[in-house]
């Protein structure tokens, strides 16, 4: 797929075999012209550039963008082989609070620019991710005891609350210990420490392609001046075509 930006092009390759739902949907939208004249509406330096909001077509300079959709989502298609190194294409989505299944937006996507990380930084990130997983287990257990917690709070039973907290924390640790710990692969460590990326997104957003030509176009968009909503002040349109079907 080719993306034009003021007559400058980049070439994107889909991961056809591994992410078929995202592949088929992306091709469908490109063929239907859904992306034509849409904007790169969200740009964050050392992170990513985002596009695909249908509402960005002919949008005013003050319009708040990023909420447009095509009326459906796509089930997540996570694959450990594909991670958020610089240049990959991934599906945007709503947050975990309203989207615990991590389903992808039906149309919005982003291209990672990211930054480089040292190995100690990546190790610290691994630890943080594992801590967050344990916290999520604790929160899930706590929700199962909400009535009990409410009664204790109403009665001012602080000792009972602390005892229950200790019990739930122990249960969460036990459950976490049974799960495989998150670890970056040697390939991820090499990529994130040399070309860079956004490792904190791994396993949470579906990666389904990458830029194979014209990364300088992405780099130029990334450094564009933006407003307080991260929207570029200078307009960058997208125009996607299908000159060639790529396969891996």
Short names for language-model regions:
Residues 1-8, 12, 239-248:
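Single conserved hydrophobic/aromatic residue that forms the stacking wall/gate
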Residues 2, 81-83, 101-103, 201, ...:
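A generic structural micro-feature
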Residues 4, 48, 67, 83, ...:
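Short glycine- and Lys/Arg-enriched binding-loop motifs that mark or flank ligand-binding interfaces
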Residues 13-97, 102, 107, 111-112:
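Internal glycine-rich, Lys/Arg-flanked active-site/core loops of soluble domains
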Residues 116-240:
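N-terminal targeting pre-sequences for secretion and organelle import
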């Amino acid at each position: 797929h080719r993306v034009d930006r003021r007559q400058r092009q980049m070439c994107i390759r889909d991961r056809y075999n591994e992410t078929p739902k995202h592949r088929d949907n992306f091709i469908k939208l490109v063929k239907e012209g859904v992306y034509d004249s849409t904007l790169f509406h969200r740009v964050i330096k050392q992170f990513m550039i985002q596009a695909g909001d249908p509402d960005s077509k002919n949008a005013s300079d003050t319009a708040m963008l990023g909420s447009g959709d095509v009326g459906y989502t796509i089930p997540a298609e996570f694959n450990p082989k594909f991670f958020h190194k610089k240049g990959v294409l991934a599906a945007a989505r709503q947050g975990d609070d309203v989207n615990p299944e991590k389903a992808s937006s039906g149309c919005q996507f982003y291209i990672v620019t990211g930054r480089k990380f040292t190995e100690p930084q990546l190790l610290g990130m691994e630890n943080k991710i594992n801590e967050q997983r344990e916290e999520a287990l604790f929160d899930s257990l706590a929700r199962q005891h909400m009535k009990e917690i409410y009664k204790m709070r109403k009665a001012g039973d602080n000792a009972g609350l602390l005892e229950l907290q200790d019990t739930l924390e122990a249960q969460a640790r036990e459950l976490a210990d049974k799960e495989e710990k998150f670890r970056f692969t040697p390939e991820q460590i090499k990529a994130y420490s040399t070309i860079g990326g956004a490792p904190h997104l791994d396993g949470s957003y579906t990666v389904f392609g990458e830029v194979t030509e014209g990364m300088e176009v992405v780099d130029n968009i990334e450094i564009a001046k933006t407003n307080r909503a991260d929207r570029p002040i200078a307009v960058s349109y997208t125009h996607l075509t299908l000159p060639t079907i790529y396969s891996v």
